[in-house]
């Protein structure tokens, strides 16, 4: 038996919004430690890793490890039926082929439940090695979203250059070039507005804009985003989900095309 | 839906001017059928509602001198029909449009020729410039100058295009109007169908092409599953797989292109080298492409085996030594070509071979039709096959292929090229290992 209850459906809604653009289907691996999801996008350029800790749920019970393959579009549809303040409960029997998602209004006057068919997804799980990143940038998630959106107008690729001076996002295309530099903030009143750079060595990497923009769909989940970079290693874009876990996106860099 | 049903269901708004031409197009009926149905409907309605009918009058203008005057077509109100019929010689009339008489109406087209009706005209000559009048946009003929409601006409157009209507409302003014819009060529079988479908086809063809170029998806699958792809060949034995990456990448030492070349030369047989070399050396090919095919004859063989290469090299030396005439002087006219290689003279032969190999590879692709052999005197003869178009085409190709190949290389890199940097999208699988 699996049962997980969240106080606010809005969190689950946001999570779904954050991944459904990249993934059509995914397997939620439930265990007593929580729920985990790992999946690559169709083109195998990016990887989404979602971790929801069991202690972040209002109620969490997972008797046996359970993998629930879901169509994320369908799940998003169901979640749209919930009010933001509703309690949401996910339930599934062991070896069941359906999951029940139940919404309860705050005053318990309205209870709605939706049953969704589960899928058998043959998805590869990748081992993600521990990496000492050369640069870790923490910045406002909104700012990052804005930058990605703006630069996407100039080019399909964004060059992220991180030095001790700061982090620079650049794009150049037919329109022209765009450079956005963010310096490390000295002292900020609000923690969420801070730009913090931890740098071992400078890094310059090129990434596809469209993926970055897909990642920024997770912006509502967190005020801050963390970009971890290292030469010839995928970028890690991490959004923390307060008290619940995190969502990490891995994006393969664009590499030098030696053969041209 | 049949016209009768549409009429019975009041689907046709007679507050607006209902044109028979529209009905013809929409319901794909013959004029007679439409006319009959419409007349019957009007008859039924007539006592209750009054209709204003317009008729198309066709006849010949009465001229004073000669008996046979000019053809005349006119759309006239029912009330004036008799006058017109009297006025015009050989007059005939047909119902053209109907609307409810009186009241306020939104303006409607009182005249609209058929958009896609194939008609055969008995005695009408094509205007010579008529075809030119049809402006086409994306292969779809634009409207013919008669103003019509865009939405409505579009709907009709698309419907009409789906099935070719072959109605022949004999000798009506529609014909002449329509005919003027038709391109002269397409009278018989040039149905609107073909015009309509072709852009769709084009679009559908263009779309995958664009997708191929733009989406990383296509690149990635190409890299993973199609080793024949130009990019995926030698320097990255399995660029798509993680393991390789981790074995090779972390050491960080990205080998220089020359090193790679050497490696691949050692490891891979010549044909495998072919494609990358093509890309790496646009400049040498340009040098050799125009007239210097003779050099590449040697190179071609030299690429095949080192022994042969040596032999040929010697032979080449010999030939060059025997004759210092420059090849440039009569490259195009002479059937026989003597070997001279300007690069050879500048560079030690063995160094040159590398470049030559590259050149040969490309040349091999370009001019497979040429026959080459050693003649009795020891000259290498390049005999161009009579098909001249081929070499001509292929000579153009190096210019064209160079940018084209760059664009093709990886679909993502093509666009990255725009950004000034030559990058291609790596797959995430290359960085993580499967559990």
UniProtKB/Swiss-Prot annotation, chain A:
What is stated as this protein's family in its record?
A: Belongs to the PCNA family.
**According to its UniProt record, in which tissues is this protein expressed?**
Expressed at high levels in adult ovary.
A GO molecular function annotation here is:
DNA polymerase processivity factor activity
Species, as recorded: Drosophila melanogaster
Does the record carry Membrane as a key word?
no
Top-rank taxon of the source lineage equals: Eukaryota
Extract one GO BP annotation from the record.
DNA damage response
Which HAMAP family does the protein's record reference? DNApol_clamp_arch
Gene inactivation effect: Mutant flies show temperature-sensitive lethality, hypersensitivity to DNA-damaging agents such as ionizing radiation and methyl methanesulfonate, suppression of position-effect variegation and female sterility.
Q: What does this protein do?
A: Likely to be an auxiliary protein of DNA polymerase delta complex and is probably involved in the control of DNA replication and repair by increasing the polymerase's processibility.
Swiss-Prot/TrEMBL keywords: Chromosome, Cytoplasm, DNA replication, DNA-binding, Nucleus
Recorded hits in NCBIfam families, A to Z, give: pcna (TIGR00590)
Its primary localisation, in coarse terms, equals: nucleus
Subunit field text: Homotrimer. Forms a complex with activator 1 heteropentamer in the presence of ATP. Interacts with E2f. Interacts with the catalytic subunits of two DNA polymerase complexes: PolD1 from the delta complex and PolE1/DNApol-epsilon255 from the epsilon complex.
Where is it localised? Answer: Nucleus; Chromosome; Cytoplasm
Question: What Gene3D superfamilies does UniProt report for this protein, alphabetically?
Answer: 3.70.10.10
Q: Which residues bind DNA?
A: 61-80
What is the designated name of this protein? Proliferating cell nuclear antigen
């Amino acid at each position: 038996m699996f049962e997980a209850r969240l106080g606010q459906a809005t969190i689950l809604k946001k999570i779904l919004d954050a991944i459904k653009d990249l993934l059509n289907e995914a397997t939620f691996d439930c265990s007593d430690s929580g729920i985990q999801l790992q999946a690559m996008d169709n083109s195998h350029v990016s990887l989404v890793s979602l971790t929801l800790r069991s202690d972040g749920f209002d109620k969490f019970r997972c008797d046996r490890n359970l993998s629930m393959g879901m169509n994320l579009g369908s799940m998003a549809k169901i979640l749209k039926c919930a009010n933001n303040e509703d309690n949401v409960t996910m339930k599934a029997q062991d070896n069941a082929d359906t999951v029940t998602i139940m919404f309860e209004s705050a005053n318990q006057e309205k209870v709605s439940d939706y049953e969704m068919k589960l899928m058998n997804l043959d998805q590869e799980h990748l081992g993600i090695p521990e990496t000492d990143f050369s640069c870790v940038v923490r910045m406002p998630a909104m700012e990052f979203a804005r930058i990605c959106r703006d630069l996407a107008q100039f080019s399909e690729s964004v060059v992220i250059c991180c030095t001790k001076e700061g982090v620079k996002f650049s794009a150049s295309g037919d329109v022209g070039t765009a450079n956005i530099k963010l310096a490390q903030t000295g002292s900020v009143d609000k923690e969420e507005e801070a730009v913090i750079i931890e740098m071992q060595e400078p890094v310059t990497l090129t990434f596809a804009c469209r993926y970055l923009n897909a990642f920024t769909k997770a912006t509502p989940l967190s005020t801050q985003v963390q970009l971890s970079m290292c030469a010839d290693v995928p970028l890690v874009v991490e959004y923390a989900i307060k008290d619940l876990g995190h969502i990490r996106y891995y994006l393969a860099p664009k590499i030098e095309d030696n053969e041209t | 839906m049949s016209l009768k049903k549409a009429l019975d269901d009041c689907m046709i708004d007679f507050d607006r001017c209902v044109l028979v031409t529209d009905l013809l197009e929409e319901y794909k009926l013959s004029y007679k059928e439409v006319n009959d149905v419409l007349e019957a409907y009007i008859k039924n309605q007539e006592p209750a509602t009054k209709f204003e009918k317009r008729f198309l009058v066709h006849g010949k203008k009465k001229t004073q001198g000669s008996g046979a005057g000019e053809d005349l077509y006119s759309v006239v109100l029912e009330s004036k029909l008799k006058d017109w019929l009297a006025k015009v010689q050989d007059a005939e009339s047909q119902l053209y449009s109907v609307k409810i008489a009186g009241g306020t109406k939104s303006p409607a087209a009182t005249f609209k020729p058929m958009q896609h009706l194939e008609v055969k005209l008995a005695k009408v000559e094509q205007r010579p410039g008529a075809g030119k009048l049809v402006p086409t946009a994306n292969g779809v003929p634009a409207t013919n100058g008669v103003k019509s409601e865009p939405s409505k006409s579009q709907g009709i157009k698309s419907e009409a295009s789906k099935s070719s209507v072959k109605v022949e409302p004999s000798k009506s003014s529609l014909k002449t109007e329509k005919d003027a819009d038709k391109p002269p060529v397409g009278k018989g079988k040039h149905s609107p169908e073909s015009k309509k479908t072709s852009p769709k086809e084009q679009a559908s063809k263009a779309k995958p092409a664009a997708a191929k170029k733009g989406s990383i998806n296509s690149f990635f699958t190409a890299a993973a599953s199609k080793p024949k792809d130009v990019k995926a060949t030698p320097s990255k034995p399995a660029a798509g797989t993680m393991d390789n990456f981790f074995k090779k990448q972390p050491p960080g030492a990205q080998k220089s292109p020359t090193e790679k070349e050497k490696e691949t030369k050692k490891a891979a047989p010549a044909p495998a080298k072919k494609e990358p070399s093509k890309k790496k050396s646009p400049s040498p090919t340009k040098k050799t492409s125009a007239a210097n095919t003779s050099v590449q004859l040697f190179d071609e063989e030299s690429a095949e085996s080192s022994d042969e290469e040596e032999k040929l090299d010697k032979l080449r030396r010999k030939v060059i030594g025997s004759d210092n005439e420059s090849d440039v002087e009569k490259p195009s006219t002479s059937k026989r070509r003597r070997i001279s290689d300007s690069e050879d003279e500048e560079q030690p032969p063995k160094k040159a071979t590398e470049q030559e190999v590259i050149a040969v590879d490309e040349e091999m692709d370009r001019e497979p039709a040429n026959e080459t052999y050693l003649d009795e005197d020891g000259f290498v003869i390049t005999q161009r096959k009579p098909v001249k178009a081929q070499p001509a085409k292929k000579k153009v190709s190096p210019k064209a292929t160079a940018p084209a190949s760059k664009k093709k290389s990886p679909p993502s890199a093509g666009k990255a090229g725009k950004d000034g940097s030559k990058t291609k999208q790596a797959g995430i699988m290359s960085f993580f290992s499967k559990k």
